């Protein structure tokens, strides 16, 4: 068998990568894709970092674990089959139960694997147990990474980063900080792995993945909220507080959990004073309005709102950065926040930058609107349903803010203009996203923008 690097270089990366749901280059023209680093984890399993370049001059690096076999394997789908190299076939190994178990075992033993391209270091956190005998299954959630669940005993979830970059990964960093501070609203970090490149300083290592505790009986916040909305819509003669699936109590508890996480991050990593990021939000507004004609009628008013805050001093700290109902889980004990990566499309430096806690609050409030208005996408003219949706939103916004205030002593509603600005910035981002990916959902952020600019 040829060397891992030789075989990996012969795979048809340019054809295979764009088919993967975690591939982020669909709006650009791919120029080239080739392995930049290859490290053998065992004889038939290689860790490959694929360097991708685009015709606009941008570049990215993706992690793929490649399992080799003598020929096609029936258990692998066409999507998981990368292609052939000499007399071997390469597969995305995360769809092979053996490969995730190998990764978890390497983390458990804090192993090291090296090649001329780099050194992969695995590390287990102190005083933790990993479910080495559990059978893995790949999560079917739509996301920018690939998560593998080990559901037995002390269950774990292994998140393998797909688009990778050098530097401190905020998801690992903040989970470690919160876990070591014993905050009850995060999943405990169990271990990590990263690659160091020859000639580069240790701080330039590239994080590749992390394992955290997994709550098998947890419910996703988004699923709970949308179920509550469906219950309300089905009970036409009842108010939101009268419906059996009322979500307000959970919204209040979620507010308390978010405030707790913010408090721990402030205690452990500090706070600072800064001015409202007017340049950043104006730049997003300008680029989005140019791409979304439906947004242009509101752009002038939104700009005025942002400019009014140019001299506003705000307290900033490390925050979640991309908080919404899909990033929270309800366990039997409490709410748990997950995925502390920040906005995945932003550079690492920006994702680690301190921001106002109102950024996270606004994210949850925007998510309430999505949960309630989502069912109206196909019923745009139903005024009764729209009124019911607004009732649900108002009730849950109030409950969340009350919970946050009770836990922190700071009511987000007291910073009305700032909170509205963060909501507007988030809605502008959503308008750009929906215009590109789900045009039918564009009315949701536009409805919110119309409301926020009218008050």
Curated annotation (Swiss-Prot):
UniProt-recorded Gene Ontology molecular function terms: ATP binding; kinase activity
One record GO biological process: trehalose biosynthetic process
Transmembrane segment boundaries: none
Keywords: ATP-binding, Carbohydrate metabolism, Glycogen biosynthesis, Glycogen metabolism, Kinase, Nucleotide-binding, Transferase
InterPro entries: Kinase-like_dom_sf (IPR011009), Mak_N_cap (IPR040999)
Pathway(s): Glycan biosynthesis; glycogen biosynthesis
Domain of life according to the entry: Bacteria
One protein family per Pfam: Mak_N_cap
SUPFAM superfamilies: Protein kinase-like (PK-like) (SSF56112)
Enzyme class: transferase
Reactions listed under catalytic activity: D-maltose + ATP = alpha-maltose 1-phosphate + ADP + H(+)
EC number: 2.7.1.175
Entry function: Catalyzes the ATP-dependent phosphorylation of maltose to maltose 1-phosphate. Is involved in a branched alpha-glucan biosynthetic pathway from trehalose, together with TreS, GlgE and GlgB.
Subunit composition and interactions: Monomer.
Homology family: Belongs to the aminoglycoside phosphotransferase family.
Entry protein name: Maltokinase
Protein species of origin: Mycobacterium ulcerans (strain Agy99)
Gene name of this polypeptide: mak
């Amino acid at each position: 068998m040829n060397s891992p690097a030789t075989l990996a270089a012969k795979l048809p990366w340019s054809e295979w990568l764009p088919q993967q749901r975690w591939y982020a280059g669909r709006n650009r023209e791919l120029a080239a894709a080739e392995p930049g680093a290859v490290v053998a984890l065992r004889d038939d399993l290689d860790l490959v970092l694929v360097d991708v370049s685009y015709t606009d001059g941008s570049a990215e690096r993706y992690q793929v674990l490649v399992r080799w076999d003598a020929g096609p394997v029936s258990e692998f789908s066409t999507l998981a089959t990368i292609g052939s190299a000499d007399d071997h076939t390469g597969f995305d190994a995360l769809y092979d139960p053996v490969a995730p178990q190998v990764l978890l075992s390497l983390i458990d033993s804090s192993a090291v694997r090296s090649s001329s391209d780099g050194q992969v270091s695995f590390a287990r956190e102190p005083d933790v147990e990993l479910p080495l005998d559990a059978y893995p299954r790949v999560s079917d959630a739509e996301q920018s990474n690939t998560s593998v669940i080990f559901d037995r005993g002390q269950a774990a979830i292994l998140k393998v980063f797909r688009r990778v970059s050098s530097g401190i990964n905020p998801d690992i960093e903040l989970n470690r900080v919160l876990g070591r501070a014993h905050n009850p609203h995060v999943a405990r970090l169990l271990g990590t792995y990263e690659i160091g490149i020859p000639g580069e300083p240790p701080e330039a290592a590239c994080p590749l993945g992390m394992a955290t505790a997994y709550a098998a009986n947890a419910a996703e916040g988004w699923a709970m909220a949308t179920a509550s909305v469906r219950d309300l819509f089905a009970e036409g003669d009842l108010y939101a507080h009268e419906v059996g699936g009322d979500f307000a109590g959970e919204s209040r508890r979620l507010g308390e959990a978010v405030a707790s996480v913010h408090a721990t991050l402030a205690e452990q990593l500090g706070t600072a004073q800064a001015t409202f990021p007017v340049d950043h939000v104006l730049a997003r507004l300008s680029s989005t309005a140019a791409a979304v004609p439906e947004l242009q009628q509101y752009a002038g008013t939104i700009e005025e709102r942002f400019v009014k805050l140019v001299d506003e001093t705000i307290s900033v700290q490390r925050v979640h950065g991309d908080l919404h109902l899909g990033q929270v889980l309800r366990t039997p004990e409490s709410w748990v926040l997950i995925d502390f990566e920040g906005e995945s499309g932003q550079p690492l430096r920006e994702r680690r930058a301190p921001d106002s806690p109102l950024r996270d609050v606004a994210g949850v409030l925007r998510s309430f609107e999505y949960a309630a208005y989502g069912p109206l996408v196909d019923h745009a003219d139903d005024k009764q349903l729209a009124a019911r949706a607004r009732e649900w939103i108002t009730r849950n916004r109030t409950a969340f803010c009350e919970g946050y205030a009770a836990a922190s002593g700071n009511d987000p509603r007291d910073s009305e203009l700032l909170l509205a600005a963060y909501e507007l910035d988030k809605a502008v981002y959503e308008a750009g996203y929906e215009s590109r990916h789900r045009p039918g959902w564009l009315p949701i952020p536009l409805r919110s923008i119309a409301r926020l600019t009218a008050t």
